[in-house]
Design a protein with these regions (language model features):
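Alpha-helical elements of Rossmann-like donor-binding domains used by nucleotide-donor carbohydrate transfer enzymes
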Residues: 22-26, 44, 58, 62, ...
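Short, acidic loop-to-helix structural element flanking the phosphoryl-transfer center
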Residues: 71-107, 118, 146, 189-190
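Active-site neighborhood of HAD-like aspartate-dependent phosphohydrolases
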Residues: 1-43, 179
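Asp-based, Mg2+/Mn2+-dependent phosphohydrolase catalytic module
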Residues: 1-2, 113-202
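Short, surface-exposed acidic
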Residues: 31-42, 68-78, 202
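Generic structural signal for small/hydrophobic residues in well-ordered secondary structure
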Residues: 9-12, 52, 98, 108, ...
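A metal-dependent, Asp-based hydrolase signature
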Residues: 47-77
Length: 202
């Protein structure tokens, strides 16, 4: 086998982005809020939330509930969660095939806040497919920061060249390659399958 470990990003590879610009705009429209005001407030609170430093309530207090609203934290968060879907032309089928083969240590390597990460893993059955979860909310670091790749390799205990990483963002792929991993940019299920076959994974 060419690799001991195969790591998958989640958003943009297996599932849609749970809270990217489009999802945020949908929530703001649904609750009749001001999108520009929300976006101007959300960057730093989201960074802290995604690193696992603060809970979702702190994020929502900073971005939505800084003044009285006619809806609750729970109602807003439920709408946020409803935005998560399977990624069209995603890699979930490939992940399931690899899991069934029992040939590789499979892991998630993603940027995600704790509450949404745990919801998405449960809703879409990812817990049964991954043996390790290397998420920004548990590591306190975010891709493409160089330290997160080194921390991931330390946790895995495998040489970097024995680790394959799949991500849809060029900067995250470049970060993995700089750390010595083999990295593939995800551009659809068929293209990924061809890449994996060429690498001897299948």
């Amino acid at each position: 086998m060419p690799f001991d470990v195969i790591l998958f990003d989640v958003a943009g590879v297996l599932l849609t982005n749970g809270w990217d610009r489009g999802e945020r705009a949908a929530a703001i429209a649904h609750f009749h809020l001001d999108l520009a005001a929300f976006e101007s407030r959300q960057l730093a609170p989201y960074d802290a939330w995604e690193r696992g430093w603060t809970p979702v309530t702190d994020y929502l207090d900073a971005t939505v509930f800084y003044e009285p609203r006619g809806f609750s934290h729970d109602e807003f968060f439920a709408f946020m969660l409803s935005q998560s879907q399977l990624q069209p032309d995603g890699a979930l089928g490939i992940l399931k095939e690899l899991a069934a083969s029992n040939q590789y240590l499979l892991g998630a390597f993603n940027n995600e806040p704790r509450e949404t990460n745990e919801y998405r893993f449960q809703r879409f059955g990812l817990r049964e497919l991954f043996q390790v979860t290397l998420c920004s909310c548990y590591l306190g670091l975010r891709k493409p920061e160089s330290a997160i790749y080194q921390q991931a390799l330390g946790i895995l205990g495998r040489p970097a060249e024995r680790v394959l990483f799949i991500d849809d963002r060029a900067e995250n792929v470049a970060g993995a390659e700089a750390a010595g991993m083999k990295a593939v940019r995800f551009e659809g299920e068929a293209a990924l399958r061809r890449e994996l076959e060429a690498l001897g994974v299948f």
